[in-house]
Amino acid sequence: MAKIENPKNYSGRELETIFFRPMLSGPDARALGIKVMYNTPVPTTLQFWKRAGDILQKYTAAGWKGGDAATKYSKQIALSKVKAEAGYSAEDYFNMVYELITGRPDVNLDDLTGTELEAAETALFKEAIAESIRATMWLGDTEREGALSTFDGFLKRLLADTGDTENDVRCTGFDPAGETAEKLLKRLWDEAPDVLRAFKPQGELVYLVTSDIYARYEEELDGVALEAAYLAKQNGREGLSFRGIPVIDIQVAPYLRSCPELPQSFALLTDRRNLALAVNTADFPGTEVRMWYNPDQMENRQRAVFMAGCDYLLPELVSMAAGGFDPELVSEPVGASGGTLSVRIPGYSFIGQVTAQGVKADGKTDGEPIALSGEKGTYGGTLAGTAIDRVRLTIELKNGASLEYTV
């Protein structure tokens, strides 16, 4: 059986130049739609400079009459020490690495040097680390058991700071089934704070959306009766924009399904420089990347130890909408005279209260509304009525927004 036994170890300068720096810079990092900070001085600080006001003055005489300096906003990003580990059977590992090598046309298979093998092994591990970092920076929660729990992600931090004051993140609710993607993007722009809209000429604004919103927006563009839309439908689009602002699919749908406490659909309009991912391998002891073969288990193992974290800076530079709270009936349908109702609702960490109301066939209410109680997304209660045809659920979010569904 073929196997790869040579150990590889990266630390110090090699850890940066060979492994992490290529992964956290360039077009791939830009495509994330956020700011990526690698090995910035500790403590890692996200900074944003606000342009100074009017600095012109009447010239009356020589001398100095300096105005106010530009305002600097800063926020320290908390870094967590994380460990990435992967293990493969010797045979599977060899096959994966060999496939990476043979897939390149510039490789001489009769003369495979150690450099070729090392590059293939490194690429395999870097891809896994980059994907884990990307998913965690959006959906991470240190209070969660299991996956994506190494550091708190953007979604948890933003939802925790939603509110109505100028120091809160503006977040509204939306029903993906009842609102087009174009209307949602327009609403985010219309409801954005003036300071955020003023940054549009700088070219750093971006829409960050989940895959369902991105796909629906692309379908809406395909439906436009223009030759350009028809050609784009055939040839595909390199990227989507709304009024000149890029729309980026953050591609976390597979992970969201395993995080039922989070809204399953969301979109935000922000400045790229307002959200930052920080990774550090230079200022903490023990950071390294190792790849070795374990002969006792006949297994190839990979390990990386580094610091990572993410945060946003200014709430006034965020306009957000959360959705995907579609209820699922887990009890028997409520009869005409009422009965026990039980529903499962995703995104429960952002839900304040759920109210149920019986509705007759003619649309009139039947009986008194009741507040459903429950935990971890399952809500229940008992409805009473005389001619209930369906049940209307009102989901009130923690920021005061409300959504209505029928079950």
Can you describe what each PLM-predicted range is?
Residues 2-40, 45-54, 152-179, 183-186, ...:
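Sequence/fold signature of self-assembling virion shell proteins
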Residues 247-252, 368-374:
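Short, surface-exposed loop motifs enriched in S/T, G, D/E and P with embedded aromatic residues
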